[in-house]
Amino acid sequence: TAALSLGSIIPGFGSNSYQEILGANEKIRIGVIGVNSRGNALAQGFAKMKGCEVTYLCDVDSRALERCQADIHKISGRTPKGEKDIRKMLESDDFEAVVIATPDHWHAKAAIMAMQAGKHVYLEKPTSHNPAENEMLVRATLKYNRIVQVGNQRRSWPNVIKAIEEIKSGAIGKVRYAKSWYVNNRPSIGTGKVVPVPDYLDWDLWQGPAPRVPNFKDNYIH
């Protein structure tokens, strides 16, 4: 849930970094990129957090954008600015940090673009599609001196941290082998059928850095 991941966001910033982000502002101003489902939940979580203000939203789906603007207004009494084009959004000085919850193929590209624009980043997992993109991401953090916090919230759960501490202390002896797995009975999105691109969607921006496909299917947006 958003509440679980939010616990890992602000603690990821050291006190000096936190003050750097704040600057002369009393609140960290946040822009959220990708606000359908997960991004909307994160935007609402930040809007409810003391010391944060969601000032800008970006999504290529106008329905998701308008829905999230309304949700944030209910929480804060203010309506964030909205934009479909990440490039135009990142030209704004209305926020210091961004939350990225786009489809996966946009993650690394959006994070690097945000750092180039001087923004700190909370990036949803996965960080990239391949090791090369991850290496580019790391180089960008060093080049632009920006903070990137990845949404691996389970690493910040107290019970997980405690277990790691006990293992390192030798509580179960020398660990020679470990096995983990994840199970989630999510329904299939199906194969979809070819339909016209809906008028509420900027399909070119949705594809972004990904290779272009000839047709749009009705299960691409879900």
Indicate residue ranges for each PLM-predicted region.
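N-terminal glycine-/serine-/threonine-rich beta1-alpha1-beta2 phosphate-ribose binding loop
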Residues: 1-123, 132-147
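A contiguous active-site-proximal alpha/beta segment in oxidoreductase catalytic domains
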Residues: 120-122, 127-208
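Redox-cofactor-proximal catalytic regions of oxidoreductases
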Residues: 49, 99, 155, 213-215
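Surface-exposed, flexible loop/turn segments at secondary-structure boundaries
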Residues: 38, 62-63, 88, 156, ...
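Surface-exposed acidic, glycine-flexible loop patches that form ligand/cofactor-binding
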Residues: 21, 91-92, 169-171, 215
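Glycine-rich, aromatic-lined ligand/substrate-binding cores of catalytic
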Residues: 35, 199-222
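Residues that line or immediately flank small-molecule/substrate-binding pockets and catalytic motifs
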Residues: 59-61, 102, 179-182, 210
